[in-house]
A protein has these predicted regions:
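An anion/phosphate-binding loop that grips the pyrophosphate of nucleotide cofactors and donors
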Residues: 65, 247
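Terminal interaction modules at protein C-ends
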Residues: 3, 175, 252-261, 351, ...
Length: 506
């Protein structure tokens, strides 16, 4: 559209661009769904949440201990759990706690899982409980379980959550109420890891010292209801690969960590390419993007969360597991990790939990969207970083002023616009506005005279004809009424353009 202005030498243009078909980088699209409440403690599959029900379940478990309580967590930073451990120990119950080493903890904040406040709480907990609880630590301790009386009245819970306040009340986390057989099996792994692989122990509540190994403790024989990753066994990875192979139509998988090069992730991609419905739940993290993009490009539906930390697998073939291991080498190939295999009823309960999260997921990964696929809040994957942008339905941009080729043709092509893939506020419909102005005469142009006939003096052209330093001819006018004559003269002289006499410049 063209609009005339009060200035005869200026014309305003507008053009609406439909940019919806333009390609965009891979993007997390906000889903705008409401987070629906749900029961945190189920029949045997629990989730964390702001009700604190999972934490209460763990405290109840510790309170029922008579002879022994064994806890394994990357770290502990929850006042209620700390108090329950203290009370349990003061009742005369032997309390064993397995944690990651202090050296490992020192590097973890850079990975974004724990903040400095959580570390401070953890260190304070060590001082408080160090004289009544036996702590053994190792860099590879990553399993998360709470067991009580494993050899007399076995009960326990396997978690994906570390025993921190944030993990138990904020994150998307899972926990499994273990059967007596599973408790006994896990106790065997914990016993071996504690006495054979621990690096340090805290006996006096003050200083960690090198741990003495107990050579008589043997690595347990793998059994059917639990899986583990140890320096001698890769049971979790093997179980995952077999479960993925068994699946015939549907797979749901959740993890915090992802490695695109790991065989398990490669197998997931392959099953998606084969046409299986693969649903992926993950935390939105830069480090995970290569794997999550590979999954999405293979056909998986990938859903993102701010705090998800749960690790689990469900398939339509009946295989299901909740585990501490991430889908990467440190977790499936090394480290100390534990997983619980689920029976049919538990598997169905896990599926319900995972589908609930899918339905309330705040983000959905689109591997190759067009701009029209995106709206509202979006995280674009650009140059190895996630950038938050707002995709608008429509927007207006002023493209500035363009000097026309000639005063009698104030129609100018639209100036270029920025690529929406690089914009922080791309719009489906972009209304572009710009002004076209008539060119002015060259400041060093010289007037040209009509050829003289006979003894007549050369006369100027009307309108004026100017020759620019490079030889280009132009017709100079001062007012719109001269345009018709200028156009005629333009043709006669073979001039390049009609310009406005510089003396008329405002």
């Amino acid at each position: 559209m063209t609009t005339n202005t009060t200035n005869p030498w200026v014309r305003t243009h507008t053009e609406v661009l439909d940019q919806r078909a333009l390609p965009m980088p891979a993007a997390w699209q906000a889903t705008q769904v409401n987070r629906l409440p749900t029961l945190e403690v189920g029949r045997s599959i629990h989730i964390s949440g702001n009700q604190g029900a999972l934490r209460d379940e763990l405290i109840t478990l510790l309170n029922q201990a008579v002879d022994m309580a064994v806890v394994c967590s990357f770290l502990i930073a929850d006042p209620a759990i700390e108090a329950a451990l203290k009370v349990t120990a003061e009742r005369g119950v032997r309390v064993y706690v397995m944690l990651a080493s202090e050296a490992r903890l020192g590097s973890e904040p850079n990975q974004g899982e724990f903040d400095q406040k959580t570390h401070a709480q953890h260190k304070a907990m060590l001082k408080t409980l160090g004289k009544s609880v036996l702590f053994r630590t190792a860099a590879h301790f990553h399993a998360k379980v709470v067991l009580v009386d494993p050899y007399t009245r076995p009960a326990g819970v396997l978690l994906t959550a570390n025993l921190t306040q944030e993990a138990l009340t904020r994150n998307e986390e899972l926990a499994v109420r273990l059967s007596p057989t599973q408790v006994e099996g896990i106790a065997g792994y914990l016993r071996w890891a504690m006495w054979q692989t621990a690096e340090h122990e805290l006996l006096d509540g003050h200083d960690f010292k090198a741990a003495k190994l107990v050579s008589s403790v043997q690595h347990p024989t793998p059994q059917g209801e639990i899986c583990a990753t140890t320096m001698k066994h890769r049971g979790i990875a093997k179980q995952l690969q077999q479960a993925l192979k068994n699946a015939s139509s549907h797979i749901i998988v959740s993890s915090f960590g992802w490695d695109v090069q790991h065989p398990v992730v490669q197998q997931l991609c392959q099953r998606a390419r084969e046409g299986l419905k693969v649903t992926v739940l993950a935390r939105v993290r830069t480090a995970a993007m290569p794997a999550l993009l590979a999954l999405a490009e293979s056909g998986a539906q990938v859903y993102g969360f701010k705090w998800l930390h749960a690790k689990a697998l469900w398939t339509d073939a009946g295989d299901a597991m909740v585990m501490s291991a991430n889908l990467e080498a440190h977790g499936l190939d090394d480290s100390f990790e534990l997983g619980a295999l689920l029976d049919v009823r538990q598997a169905e309960e896990l599926k319900v939990r995972l589908e609930h999260w899918q339905n309330i997921a705040p983000w959905h990964l689109l591997p190759a969207p067009t701009l029209g696929d995106l709206s509202g809040e979006v995280q674009l994957w650009r140059n190895g970083q996630l950038n938050r942008v707002q995709v608008l339905t429509e927007a207006e941009v002023n493209l500035g002023e363009v000097v026309a080729q000639s005063a009698h043709q104030l129609e100018t092509p639209r100036p270029g616009v920025s690529n929406p893939s690089q914009s922080d506020d791309p719009a489906h419909q972009l209304k572009c506005c710009w002004t076209a102005t008539a060119p002015y005469s060259h400041p060093k142009a010289s007037p040209q005279m009509r050829p003289a006939q006979g003894n007549e003096k050369p006369q100027p052209y009307s309108p004026k004809v100017l020759r620019e330093p490079d030889g280009r001819l132009t017709i100079a006018i001062t007012q719109p009424s001269e345009l018709n004559a200028a156009v005629q003269l333009l043709g006669e002289m073979g001039a390049a353009a009609i310009v406005i006499d510089r003396g008329q410049r405002p």
